[in-house]
From Swiss-Prot:
InterPro entries linked to this entry: Puta_zinc/iron-chelating_dom, UCP006173
Species this protein is from: Mesorhizobium japonicum (strain LMG 29417 / CECT 9101 / MAFF 303099)
Top-level division of the source organism's lineage: Bacteria
N-terminal signal peptide: none
Record-stated family: Belongs to the UPF0260 family.
Protein name: UPF0260 protein mll2411
């Protein structure tokens, strides 16, 4: 059996298709996060981006997301090593740290549904869309105690 590409290649060596396939579809990147201006600490919310599809846990306009959502962060092999808010379960983060993917990742399980079945994704856990919130202070109502 051939060794999986994420165990043999660096992030920089991956093809665009391999890179995109690393996304486990959890949807956590698409949640609004709050940053404490004094400490830099990141606080998670249950507020989804305006383009977030809460059923699929994917972007509804992935190809145009960076143009349509100014705060959207396009992940690259370079920035996944420095973005502190990437979830601890994020495949990009795991591979960058030299760790293996979890059993529920679609590249391991063979199914895009296992991330949902394992309770890792945000399916059913997003409580609002950023389009629902009138004031910046409204985000505080959706703060989570920990990383989802």
């Amino acid at each position: 059996m051939e060794t999986p590409f994420w165990k043999t290649k660096t992030l920089e060596q991956m093809s665009p298709a391999e890179w995109e396939s690393l996304c486990d579809g959890c949807g956590k990147c698409c949640l609004s996060k709050l940053e404490d201006e004094d400490t830099g600490e990141i606080y998670w919310t249950s507020v989804g981006c305006r383009l977030f599809d809460a059923q699929t846990c994917r972007c509804s306009d992935y190809a145009n997301r960076l143009a349509r959502v100014p705060d959207c962060v396009g992940l690259t092999p370079q920035n996944v090593r420095t973005i502190s808010w990437l979830p601890s379960t994020c495949a990009y983060r795991l591979v960058a740290e030299g760790r293996d993917l979890y059993w529920w990742h679609r590249l391991v399980s063979g199914s895009a549904e296992t991330v949902h079945e394992a309770g890792i994704s945000m399916r059913g856990r997003v409580k609002a869309s950023e389009t629902d919130l009138a004031e910046p202070e409204d985000y505080f109502d959706y703060m989570l105690d920990d990383e989802p």
